[in-house]
Amino acid sequence: MSASASSLSAFNPKSLPLCVSRPASVSVLPPSLSFKLHSDHLVSIFASSALKCSSPAEYPSRFVRNVAVSSDFEVEEDDMFADGDDSAPVERNSFSPDLKLFVGNLSFNVDSAQLAQLFESAGNVEMVEVIYDKVTGRSRGFGFVTMSTAAEVEAAAQQFNGYEFEGRPLRVNAGPPPPKREESFSRGPRSGGYGSERGGGYGSERGGGYGSERGGGYGSERGGGYGSQRSGGGYGGSQRSSYGSGSGSGSGSGSGNRLYVGNLSWGVDDMALENLFNEQGKVVEARVIYDRDSGRSKGFGFVTLSSSQEVQKAINSLNGADLDGRQIRVSEAEARPPRGQF
């Protein structure tokens, strides 16, 4: 059973009428919701606190009057299509994947009700899900809309791809989401990131990224990662190079001229990051960090320049600058603390 499904089992369903005093408002709902639209069912709310309503007669709109509300914050694509428990209140497997649209570059203020209202003009909306981070509770800037027919899916994709909504152009793709990038992120006990011999990706058993036991990182032999205990190393580090490591003294691309770049739009990739910083100096490396399971951007990255003067110039010029609709944060990168300090 997936982590999302397990988290649902901790909640006891309660059937309650949903009502608000002002029909135009949907503020009665929590921000982290998955909406499933029906015609003749009560509202099932799964949450740790109950809503109190004096009358079931008034509803904010037809998009929220009969809604199955899930306590999930973050829903991975595999969970959306996996066979769920028979007792699960929200059946994510009830619609064909071909009827689902991916909607990206959402404003963080957009919730499922607003998205449903938008897509109504393209046809009959069956389900809307805006995905939220399960740690912060903040929207991750994307969601899914399920239509009732393939023709409506095509019409919605044509109508809304590139459509500006709440100040941001939407990215709308028809069909199921792309497969996870398992070919890029090996997860075996002796595997790792990009072409490493015994190290590699993100936290593998004997290699990998951040604070691993025996190193990892990008293309290293046994190095890489941030603050590894025995074989550390920066991106593409040598056998005993380190970036905040317990052993070794740094090589690879080094940390002295490395910048942290945060609050990136989900659509920004390595090339976009490199092009932005090319104006500030010679870019040695530009890399956006991706989630190991979903393959999606984690919203931050690192840029290495050739000199400390270029680093300061980049900070002064680009910290707070607008990139793809978001104000980026630029600062000098620091070594992450050892695992015991988290």
Curated annotation (Swiss-Prot):
PROSITE patterns (UniProt xref): RRM (PS50102)
Cellular localisation: Plastid, Chloroplast
Any GO BP annotation: cold acclimation
Signal sequence annotation: none
GO cellular component: a single term: ribonucleoprotein complex
Comp. bias intervals (Gly residues): 190-237, 245-255
Region annotation (Linker (Gly-rich)) ranges: 178-256
Residues with the Phosphoserine modification: S107, S204
Domain RRM: 99-177, 257-335
GO molecular function: RNA binding
Record InterPro entries: Euk_RNA-bind_prot, Nucleotide-bd_a/b_plait_sf, RBD_domain_sf, RRM2_NsCP33-like, RRM_dom
Keywords: Chloroplast, mRNA processing, Phosphoprotein, Plastid, Repeat, Ribonucleoprotein, RNA-binding, Transit peptide
Pfam families associated with the record: RRM_1
Segment annotated as transit peptide: 1-65
UniProt-annotated stretches for the region Disordered: 167-255
Reported phenotype of the disruption mutant: No visible phenotype under normal growth conditions, but mutant plants exhibit increased sensitivity to cold stress.
Stated role: Stabilizes specific chloroplast mRNAs. Required for normal chloroplast development under cold stress conditions by stabilizing transcripts of numerous mRNAs under these conditions.
PANTHER family the UniProt entry points to: 29 KDA RIBONUCLEOPROTEIN, CHLOROPLASTIC, OS02G0815200 PROTEIN
Name listed for the protein in its UniProt record: 29 kDa ribonucleoprotein, chloroplastic
Gene name tied to this protein: CP29A
